[in-house]
């Protein structure tokens, strides 16, 4: 439903926004030192996340970066929270809603379906803000974000948590996603039916094959019974 414009300036501009906030609030290091330290911390966190499928909040990344640079700010400090907000503000510039997303959710609600979102993201509050900004939040019964429950897709725990919040069994649910390893495999492993939005040509093995493949979100309405 939500896509990110991953152009060449995306990551760098988000990081510069964090640095600008920190520089204006007493953190006296060069951008080069900050960037190098941040990228090292991020790499270490990503490696742990990929092994454990646990999702720490983005503020952990900021706090650990600052501590390595000699500034003892924990995740609850106003400085770390402000840096996270700076990141979020810049990030929002690169997010856009999939065409017809609101209409699809509205039609599904009219047909009597409960809907939810499972998102792998380290800034939960930003996800809520984005969903609200694009008029999607009011059509969702459940919103599950990895950093809120410290589990990320394809961990079965995050899918089961969402199912429990919706009050449905896996066999009654359909999961729609655009990645095989994260979305489709994870949902299949807990017994959900799956729909792959194939945004680009994908080599699909028999063990990863979704129940349905569509080209755009609006095609989902041709699959879901009236």
What is each PLM-predicted segment?
Residues 1-98, 107:
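N-terminal helical cap/lid subdomain that shapes the substrate entry/recognition surface
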Residues 4-9, 25-32, 102, 106-109, ...:
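Asp-based, Mg2+/Mn2+-dependent phosphohydrolase catalytic module
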